[in-house]
């Protein structure tokens, strides 16, 4: 984009009063102090241009002032604008104003007072042609903004600058670490120590939790290995238990059958004993301690029951026999 010379401000300018603008602005108030003037351009270093041969030392300053008064105003404005553009360096559009080269001693007293009274916003309003075009939503209001006074531009630029400073301070506060506070007045050392202690304790607790989790994982792995090793043995023992349970049930059934057979056999034995006892003859009585089945030394005694049934004669003779049998007993 081609650089054009700055626009001439719409104000009543008194060109001979550049050097004495301080009193003029002081008399007219704050509004005239913020209005742009051409003293800012005279304060910038002038580019080299053909000069007349040097004069003696005592009349050099007077001759230079006369030459500046006889030069046309548009020539000074153009030369000052080009010098300002060459000596200025703006990093981005958001920067307030350019970095100007140091002012030479010859031109320091020409417009220094007016240049000191100008702030960055006024200089930015002078170089408004270099700025980027406004966003689409602000294009309809462009004529009204261009017709506004320089004070409106200054207020808008002040708001932008304040916002940028606030964002920068916020970024610095966010970027500052607790261990390295931004300023000792805003950060409490006790609070910093407490925060550091809390972080260290939290880190230690996290380490302990990780160690506990790793130990649990190792124990789970070892238990899974043991389970995989013991699973076949457990399956084999379970099969053996099922076989033993089946054999035990068979044995119980056999024991029950044998018990029933024993009961039947016991019942049959008792019945046979009763039948045998009924078929046997009655038992014979014993005499004087000698069993009925034995035989004594004397003659065989006679049975009394038949003698009683047959008659009384033999019954009566029986005591004689007994008496005759044992004569010594008398």
From Swiss-Prot:
Region annotation Disordered: where it falls in the sequence: 1-207, 267-330
Membrane-spanning ranges: none
Claim: Amino-acid biosynthesis is one of the keywords in the record: no
Record's GO cellular component terms: nucleus
Main localization, broad class: nucleus
Tissue specificity comment: Expressed in roots, shoots and panicles.
PANTHER family on file: BASIC LEUCINE ZIPPER 34, BASIC LEUCINE ZIPPER 61
Induction context: Down-regulated by dehydration and salt stress.
Entry's localization field: Nucleus
UniProt region (Basic motif), positions on chain: 190-209
Region Leucine-zipper, annotated ranges: 216-244
Protein name: Basic leucine zipper 2
Chain intervals with Low complexity compositional bias: 57-72, 139-151
PROSITE patterns tied to this protein: BZIP, BZIP_BASIC
Sequence ranges of Pro residues compositional bias: 45-56
Compositionally biased tracts (Basic residues): 21-34
Residues covered by the bZIP domain: 188-244
Compositionally skewed regions (Basic and acidic residues) per UniProt: 155-166
Keywords: DNA-binding, Nucleus, Transcription, Transcription regulation
